[in-house]
Amino acid sequence: MISARFSGRQGDFTLDAAFDVPGQGVTALFGPSGCGKTTVLRCMAGLTRLPGGHLVVNGVTWQEGRQITPPHRRAVGYVFQEASLFTHLSVRENLVYGLRRARGPLRISEAEVTQLLGIDPLLRRPTATLSGGERQRVAIGRALLSQPELLLMDEPLSALDRISRDEILPYLERLHASLQMPVILVSHDLSEVERLADTLVLMEAGRVRAAGPIAAMQADPNLPLIHRPDLAAVIEGVVIALDPAYGLSTLQVPGGRIVVPGNLGPIGARRRLRVPATDVSLGRHAPTDTTILNALPAVILGAEAAEGYQITVRLALGASGEGASLLARVSRKSFDLLGFQPGEQVVARLKAMALSAPAQTGG
């Protein structure tokens, strides 16, 4: 468990943020620019000191009021927006620098880091010859090799162009699946958060609006996320079948099975799906003579008005609503004509080609 409380003023900005999140997996601090995300991250690293603070990381106290463990005595890896590499050193020499800074036991080896981040071919190269995405991967590798108990990442993709972001995201997803250490990720990009985070801390104007599992936060009618035009549900599943003849994979998810384009193998691999709410339609019966491959039983939990004469319908997969959360954005007219009610069992139809899952980088 990570328990954090930080309060105080910095110039004209007042921070009063508190949250408790799991001591493993990826937690995203999400919110608009200037809401205090980076300030919280710097407090966790010990780089910013606010006397009204409290920080316990998996049973180890790093701050209790004015008793503050200095940064160099915290087992923290910090990845900045800009990859701050030593330009006079090679890639491998930058990584070795991280190893030399290690304070605790060996949690991850150089070989594991280079394999996870795909930087083996770069080891002999000068850092000046690297692309933006390659530089950031090396910076992450160096932070990991310092053997941290906590990895802090301050908008690690914000300085990259779209091509470089698309290059590095699959490697971050591999880290997410492989690392045991907790990661705190600062981001204002919801699509990035949906791909990487398990837990979401929603911040507004220096305060924490809410915190919890990302799927629950997306579907919470009391939070602003549910009103976003790019609303989507995040669903975790396990690959149970591959269909190479048609280029499809089948995932078992809580409450049903979903067919997805692409080879997401191997069998048994855990994958995360992003299901856009606008690509989910509802009916009372399973469709026939249709191109839609996914028709899953679901239960309506509730509905909220959305912009443009639309309705956002909150659902739970499964005949009894025992499965994963799902969201559908439908026209108000169709919703009223069909007379859907909370508690009613319906069939959720998902367009397979609209579903997206992480690209695989091998292994």
Curated annotation (Swiss-Prot):
Residue ranges occupied by any ABC transporter domain in the UniProt entry: 1-230
Gene Ontology molecular functions: ABC-type molybdate transporter activity; ATP binding; ATP hydrolysis activity
Enzyme class: translocase
Chain coiled-coil ranges: none
Reactions mediated catalytically: molybdate(out) + ATP + H2O = molybdate(in) + ADP + phosphate + H(+)
Database matches in SMART domains: AAA
A single cellular component GO annotation: plasma membrane
Main subcellular location of this protein, as a coarse class: membrane
Ligand binding (ATP): 31-38
UniProt xrefs under InterPro entries: AAA+_ATPase, ABC_transporter-like_ATP-bd, ABC_transporter-like_CS, Mo/tungstate-bd_C_term_dom, ModC_ABC_ATP-bd, Molybdenum_import_ModC, Mop_domain, P-loop_NTPase
Family that this chain belongs to: Belongs to the ABC transporter superfamily. Molybdate importer (TC 3.A.1.8) family.
Assembly with partners or alone: The complex is composed of two ATP-binding proteins (ModC), two transmembrane proteins (ModB) and a solute-binding protein (ModA).
Task performed by this protein: Part of the ABC transporter complex ModABC involved in molybdenum import. Responsible for energy coupling to the transport system.
Protein name in UniProt: Molybdenum import ATP-binding protein ModC
Taxonomy of the source species: Bacteria, Pseudomonadati, Pseudomonadota, Alphaproteobacteria, Rhodobacterales
